């Protein structure tokens, strides 16, 4: 489900993270590059699952999480902060859809 604002609130989101289910890391990275070429500041921020980070791996004996590992290669984030206009959000959405 897409996030939404109520009439009495203003959102404070700054990123909208998307998962390209079934995509490879290379496909995700190409989409990010294509979005950047169109002026959209897409980024892959969550490259390392928390269970693989040394603190958690060493102190909590984190077990393997294969779906989490796969998701880390498929997710990327889009800029959706309060300064982004409705028109810009529509452009971002339409551009993503045209590229996938």
Task: Identify the residue ranges that each predicted region occupies.
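PLP-dependent aminotransferase class I/II
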Residues: 1-100
């Amino acid at each position: 489900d897409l996030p939404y604002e109520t009439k009495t609130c203003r959102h404070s989101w700054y990123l909208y993270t998307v998962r390209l289910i079934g995509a490879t890391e290379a496909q995700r990275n190409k989409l990010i590059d294509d979005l950047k070429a169109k002026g959209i500041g897409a980024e892959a921020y969550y490259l390392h699952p928390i269970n693989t980070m040394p603190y958690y791996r060493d102190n909590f004996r984190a077990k393997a999480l294969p779906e989490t590992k796969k998701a880390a290669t498929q997710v990327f984030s889009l800029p959706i902060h309060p300064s982004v206009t409705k028109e810009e959000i529509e452009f971002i959405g339409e551009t993503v859809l045209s590229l996938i």
